[in-house]
């Protein structure tokens, strides 16, 4: 699993409420979360398919 996929999910401080996906290293699956629009890390993908291609 690439290092960016092991980063914790990070919503960020903004309040844009953008649907995104991240790799949950505990469950081994890509899961949805609501991204605030700024201040995230590299464990953030536009689609579940992109997340799975990169991490799962």
UniProtKB/Swiss-Prot annotation:
Keyword field: Disulfide bond, Nematocyst, Protease inhibitor, Secreted, Serine protease inhibitor
Disulfide bonds: 5-55, 14-38, 30-51
Chief location category: secreted
Subcellular localization, as worded in the UniProt entry: Secreted; Nematocyst
Limits of the BPTI/Kunitz inhibitor domain: 5-55
Distribution of this protein across tissues and organs: Expressed by acrorhagi.
Pfam families recorded: Kunitz_BPTI
SUPFAM superfamilies in alphabetical order: BPTI-like (SSF57362)
InterPro entries, alphabetized: Kunitz_BPTI, Kunitz_BPTI_sf, Prtase_inh_Kunz-CS, TFPI/VKTCI-like
Top-level taxonomic group: Eukaryota
GO cellular component, one term: nematocyst
A GO MF label: serine-type endopeptidase inhibitor activity
Site keyed Reactive bond for trypsin: positions: 15-16
PROSITE patterns cross-referenced by the UniProt entry: BPTI_KUNITZ_1, BPTI_KUNITZ_2
Miscellaneous field: Does not inhibit potassium channels (Kv), as well as metalloproteases, and cysteine proteases (papain and bromelain).
Function: Serine protease inhibitor that is strongly active against trypsin (900 IU/mg) and moderately active against plasmin.
UniProt family annotation: Belongs to the venom Kunitz-type family. Sea anemone type 2 potassium channel toxin subfamily.
Protein name (record): PI-actitoxin-Afv2b
Species name: Anthopleura fuscoviridis
Organismal lineage: Eukaryota, Metazoa, Cnidaria, Anthozoa, Hexacorallia
